[in-house]
Each structure stands twice: as C-alpha cells, then as structure tokens.
C-alpha cells in the first residue's frame, strides 16, 4: 500500500473521530483541510432511504444555490431559428441541432448541461444512451426541456444544480468552492438539503434522510447531523 502524503495524513487525523457535526462545524473543518494548490470543490453526499429502481421512489430535482457553485458551467442547447439565436444571446456555449447530435455521437461532449426546445426531442432522444448515463439528458421535470431557452441558460450559468438519486439511493453534488466564505457554504448546503427534502417521493418509507456527509475534492469526508442540515 502506498504511503499517505503528509497533507493527506494530517487531513485524516484532523477529522478522525468527528461525526454528526453541525453544518457550521463541518464546513469550517472542510475549509481548514482543503489545502491543495487549486480551489477545491466542496461536495455533499446524502444517503436516502429510497430504492430508485422503483419509479415511486426516484428522487430528482433542481435547486438554485443562493451563492452559486463557483464553477464555470458549459451549456449546450438544441434549438433552431429564433430559439437558437436566443440561446446564443443568453450565453450558451454550444448551439445546434443535427450537427450537435453528430458531434455528441462522435464522442465529443464538451458541456456540463444540455437544454432543448420541445421540438428538438426527437433528435435528442437518439442520444439517450450517451447523455443518460452522464445525467445530461434534457428533462422537462428539471426545466431543461423548455421554450424559455434564455431563462434555462441563465439558470444553468447562475448556479443551478441538478440532482438525481443513484442506484444505492445516494444523491451528491458540488455546493461551492473551498474559497467561499463559511456562511455562504452553509447557506448553499442548507438550500441543497432543503431541495432534496422537498423532492421526497411518495413511495419513500421510513427514514428518508439517513446520512449526510461533506468533503472537499481532495479531503476526507465528515458526517453532518441530519437535524442540523435540515434545521429541525
């Protein structure tokens, strides 16, 4: 087994034995241990009491974090005519129709969010096996299949975060950068947790939020008391 670097070892020792912290305590600890040369992303992982293999237990949604993500989001838009022009004016990075489909089919995926007007879905539908596993498939439930292209592009660029439960019932996302003020990270964490709480599906039984953890890109994770994150 490879030896741990001094920085990694120190970070792990700093969080050893610490669990069920308040959001404020966890954020302070994460920031203190984010010592890489780049601005690490602060990430949240939530273990939910759901089985997303069942349709009535799927957790999916979108939330606009009050302080943004600190990430530059690249947006692709499937649109034609005036709507394509609207997307470009709103700041979309890539705009197209069949040409964009062919680019994606060739394996070139240079975007973080994909938006489409409803009339484009027959084309976009052919890309399901490529975009679906990457959580990039446009979906009306999260506002990425829409005629209001301008609003969708601006939301994506402005700190909107999509979330979806994975097979094990885990939802994860970036909620800011380690360089953010502690108060701003705390706000973002609580906004994300609140959105996941409101997305509780009808088929969820028993305890819904089982565990919440925060970490930075290169740092160890710490568990957060669910009550602290939800404000209960």
Swiss-Prot record:
Molecular-function annotations in GO: rRNA binding; structural constituent of ribosome; tRNA binding
GO cellular component: cytosolic large ribosomal subunit
One Pfam family this sequence matches: Ribosomal_L1
Gene3D superfamilies: 3.30.190.20, 3.40.50.790
UniProt key word Cell membrane: no
Alphabetical keyword list: Repressor, Ribonucleoprotein, Ribosomal protein, RNA-binding, rRNA-binding, Translation regulation, tRNA-binding
Chloroplast in keyword set: no
GO biological process: regulation of translation; translation
SUPFAM superfamilies (alphabetical): Ribosomal protein L1
Function noted in UniProt: Binds directly to 23S rRNA. The L1 stalk is quite mobile in the ribosome, and is involved in E site tRNA release.
UniProt record similarity statement: Belongs to the universal ribosomal protein uL1 family.
PANTHER family to which the protein is assigned, alphabetical: 54S RIBOSOMAL PROTEIN L1, MITOCHONDRIAL, LARGE RIBOSOMAL SUBUNIT PROTEIN UL1M
Subunit: Part of the 50S ribosomal subunit.
Name this protein carries in UniProt: Large ribosomal subunit protein uL1
């Amino acid at each position: 087994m490879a030896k741990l670097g001094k920085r990694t070892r120190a970070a792990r020792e700093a969080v050893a034995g610490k669990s069920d912290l308040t959001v404020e305590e966890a954020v302070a600890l994460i920031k203190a241990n984010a010592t890489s040369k780049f601005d690490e992303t602060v990430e949240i992982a939530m273990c939910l009491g759901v089985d997303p293999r069942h349709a009535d237990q799927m957790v999916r949604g979108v939330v606009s974090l009050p302080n943004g993500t600190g990430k530059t989001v690249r947006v692709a838009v499937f649109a034609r005519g005036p709507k394509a022009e609207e997307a470009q004016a709103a700041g979309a990075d890539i705009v197209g129709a069949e040409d964009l489909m062919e680019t994606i089919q060739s394996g070139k995926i240079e975007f973080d969010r994909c938006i489409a007007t409803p009339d484009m879905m027959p084309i976009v539908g052919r890309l399901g096996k490529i975009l679906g596993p990457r959580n990039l498939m446009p979906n009306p439930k999260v506002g990425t299949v829409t005629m209001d292209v301008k609003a969708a592009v601006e939301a994506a660029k402005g700190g909107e975060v999509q979330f979806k439960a994975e097979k094990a019932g885990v939802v994860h996302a970036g909620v800011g950068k380690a360089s953010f003020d502690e108060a701003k990270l705390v706000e973002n964490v609580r906004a994300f947790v609140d959105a996941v709480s409101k997305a509780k599906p009808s088929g969820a039984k028993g305890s819904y939020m089982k565990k919440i953890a925060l970490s930075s890109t290169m740092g160890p994770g710490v568990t957060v008391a669910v009550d602290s994150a939800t404000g209960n």
